[in-house]
Amino acid sequence: MHNKIYNSFIDRKAKGIKSFAVLIDPDKVNPADIADLAAKCTAAKVDYIFLGGSLVITNHLDECVQQFKTLCDIPVVLFPGSPSQVSRYADALLYLSVISGRNPELLIGQHVLSAPAVKKSGLEVISTGYVLIDGGAPTTVSYISNTTPIPSDKDDIAMCTAMAGEMLGMKVVFMDAGSGARKPITESMISRVASQVSAPIIVGGGIRDAEKAYLNCKAGADIIVVGNAIEKETSLIKEMADAVHAAAPVLK
């Protein structure tokens, strides 16, 4: 199994280079939007395009992936809300296990059902410990996953959860406050997790401005994911990408 995308996560982390990913929900874009998004992502030097959502009702995931692949050279990584969200045209798949919850279906149940199709797709599969953090309001992901998020002020619980995920073999930790969260994850929580986990840390949910993206990187996030804010204002793509890239250490 090829590991090009995962290796890029590892290489960038080792060099202290921070990455910016734009999260796009296939339900919320039409073919006309994709050309504009691809151009803006390319101009902003976006590192990854994450594609998926808690609910993907439409069936044009393949078309969406292929359009991005045609229009830009940015790697497309699937961020699936369910096992059905698989496209063989993508560069990689984040194989999410909701380790912050106690819903067995999202820890392993759905993975058992989806494993044959995922393997057949030939996609690069990146095992991902998904840690849902309370963002101050019920989110689609907490409702759909039927799990209780980790309280936003319980840094040690988040740390221990991420540590357990890494020791169980998860290659990546994804800390998420959920789409449209009122409050993003605190820097103190990110820092606590980063102090004990060597796997790449992805952080998303509730990040609405460039300063927050920058501070999250400084706290220990390796990849910043923004979706909801960009859906509302695509001009933020360059602003946030620049802030994330500016958080890398200065090479002498």
Swiss-Prot record:
It catalyses: sn-glycerol 1-phosphate + (2E,6E,10E)-geranylgeranyl diphosphate = sn-3-O-(geranylgeranyl)glycerol 1-phosphate + diphosphate. One of its GO terms (cellular component) is cytoplasm. Its EC number is 2.5.1.41. Prenyltransferase that catalyzes the transfer of the geranylgeranyl moiety of geranylgeranyl diphosphate (GGPP) to the C3 hydroxyl of sn-glycerol-1-phosphate (G1P). HAMAP family: GGGP_HepGP_synthase. Homohexamer. This is Geranylgeranylglyceryl phosphate synthase. It comes from Chitinophaga pinensis (strain ATCC 43595 / DSM 2588 / LMG 13176 / NBRC 15968 / NCIMB 11800 / UQM 2034). The lineage of its organism: Bacteria, Pseudomonadati, Bacteroidota, Chitinophagia, Chitinophagales.
